[in-house]
Swiss-Prot record:
Record note on quaternary structure: Monomer. Component of the 2-(3-amino-3-carboxypropyl)histidine synthase complex composed of DPH1, DPH2, DPH3 and a NADH-dependent reductase, predominantly MCR1.1.
Protein name according to UniProt: NADH-cytochrome b5 reductase 1
Function: NADH-dependent reductase for DPH3 and cytochrome b5. Required for the first step of diphthamide biosynthesis, a post-translational modification of histidine which occurs in elongation factor 2. DPH1 and DPH2 transfer a 3-amino-3-carboxypropyl (ACP) group from S-adenosyl-L-methionine (SAM) to a histidine residue, the reaction is assisted by a reduction system comprising DPH3 and a NADH-dependent reductase, predominantly MCR1.1.
GO terms (BP aspect): protein histidyl modification to diphthamide; tRNA wobble base 5-methoxycarbonylmethyl-2-thiouridinylation
Binding site for FAD: 147-162, 173-205
UniProt membrane topology term: Single-pass membrane protein
Protein EC: 1.6.2.2
Gene3D superfamilies: Nucleotide-binding domain of ferredoxin-NADP reductase (FNR) module, Translation factors
Cofactor: FAD
Domain FAD-binding FR-type, residue spans: 64-167
This protein's encoding gene: MCR1.1
Length: 308
């Protein structure tokens, strides 16, 4: 080998110039201080431009303006529940939803504007997309509307919303009661706590469903419970358990709450509840009977018992 750079089909003087350039010449240029300074300047300029561009670009969410997001993917995770992936305007966008808050979803159905609230289950750093896990109910206007969407159809969204915003060290022991898709705000909080080493909050989650196949995000929940067994206690309750089931059976009871969740007299603790309305009503009654404070009609961050 001669060490000459092979050049084909380059016209005129440029070709003649490059024919006399060796690979060694190129290496010398690439290692020269001037070249390194120029390359560094280009990298810095690109980073600066990217930062300025991203900071001036509108955020995906606005609490006062409805925005449309196209459906990118649908993944059926149980007979009546699916994970819907929606596309953000730019590939580098993150949704920017504070931990514990939710979005509003709106649709015009039968001449009426219907609004419901959902907490995305996508991770905080997910770029270019967000995910909603939604159970379709026979009489659920919004859930049936979302289920009817085809890839490319848009969903009208506004946010963030909500009175709960998790910050590290909010409380020492967090007790959670979730039913079905009510897991959504809980999994966001669980992830935020366990994946932040300085946050030493202990968590107990009672998660209720009808059938075993209805347990959502089970692989992730089980992995977190195994990986953080000293800080994350996970207890499943099933209404229709399979043979050999070792978890709770039936509904979440006062006994489950007394045995697993923080004591009502434990000062540095909170109880969070999210699930279908009948379940929430039953849990409020159970908590009241074992001397937890009665939840407010509209929960606030400093409440002992917070209902999403």
């Amino acid at each position: 080998m001669s060490g000459r750079v092979e050049v084909e089909n380059i016209p005129g003087q440029v070709a003649n110039l490059l024919k006399n350039v060796t690979a060694g010449d190129l290496l010398n240029v690439a290692s020269s201080p001037a070249f390194l300074v120029a390359a560094a300047a280009i990298v810095i300029a690109a980073a600066f431009y990217s930062k300025v561009f991203n900071s001036t670009r509108p955020k995906p969410l606005d609490p006062s303006i409805w925005k449309e997001f196209p459906l990118q993917k649908k993944n059926q995770v149980s007979p009546n529940t699916a994970i819907y992936t929606f596309k953000l305007p730019h590939a580098e966008d993150v949704l920017g939803l504070p931990i514990g808050q939710h979005i509003s979803v709106s649709a015009d159905i039968n001449g009426k504007n219907i609004v419901r609230s959902y907490t995305p289950i996508s991770r905080q750093n997910a770029r270019g997309r967000f995910e909603l896990i939604i159970k379709t109910y026979e009489k659920g206007n919004i859930s049936r509307h979302v289920a009817s969407l085809k890839i490319g159809d848009t969903l009208r969204v506004k946010g963030p919303k909500g009175n709960f915003k998790y910050t590290p060290g909010l409380t020492a022991h967090l007790g959670m009661i979730a039913g079905g898709t009510g897991l959504a705000p809980m999994i966001q909080i669980v992830r935020a706590i366990l994946q932040n080493p300085p946050d030493r909050t202990n968590i107990t989650l009672i998660y209720a469903n009808v059938n075993e196949e209805d347990i959502l995000l089970r692989a992730e929940l089980d992995a977190l419970a195994m990986g953080y067994e000293s800080r994350f206690n996970l207890f499943y309750v099933l209404n229709n358990p399979p043979s050999g089931w070792t978890g709770g059976v039936g509904f979440v009871t006062k006994e489950h709450i007394k045995d697993l969740l923080p004591n009502p007299n434990e000062s540095n603790s909170k109880i969070l509840i999210c699930g279908p309305p009948p379940m929430v009503t039953a849990m409020k009654k159970n908590l009241e009977e074992i001397k937890y404070p009665v939840p407010n009609t509209i929960s606030k961050l400093d409440d002992k018992v917070f209902v999403f």
